[in-house]
Curated annotation (Swiss-Prot):
The lineage of its organism: Eukaryota, Metazoa, Ecdysozoa, Arthropoda, Chelicerata. Transmembrane segments: none annotated. Expressed by the venom gland. Disulfide bonds join 48-63, 55-72, 62-87, 74-85. This is Toxin-like structure LSTX-D1. One of its GO terms (molecular function) is toxin activity.
Length: 115
């Protein structure tokens, strides 16, 4: 019985050692592959469409404001048949940005008082 326990402990030790060696080898190969892919990567970012400019050519190209991305909103002008699309910021997001800005300013004042 003691011999069986000894062999099982030895087997588990060798198995864990060999598996960690295989994982380390796999990690180093994967890391080298990732580095080579990152070196060959090219920048694909295109210019964004500013607020209140036409976004009908690409509805997902609106720029980001400080916290949120602007939304391409389409509408028909009064008396017109053509659809007009512009990048706009929804009002609820505008109010959220204002509230966040005021909270930052208030936090700065508190830091001055107690900091």
């Amino acid at each position: 019985m003691k011999v069986l326990v000894l062999f099982s402990v030895l087997f588990l030790t060798l198995f864990s050692y060999s598996s960690t060696e295989a994982i380390d080898e796999f990690d180093s190969d994967a890391e080298e592959d990732m580095l080579s892919l990152m070196a060959n990567e090219q920048v694909r970012a295109k210019a964004c469409t500013p607020r209140l400019h036409d976004c009908s050519h690409d509805r997902h190209s609106c720029c980001r404001s400080e916290l949120f991305k602007d939304v391409c909103t389409c509408f028909y002008p009064e008396g017109g048949d053509n659809e007009v699309c512009t990048c706009q910021q929804p009002k609820h997001l505008k109010y959220m940005e204002k509230a966040a800005d005021k909270a930052k300013k208030f936090g700065g004042k508190i830091k001055k008082w107690f900091g």
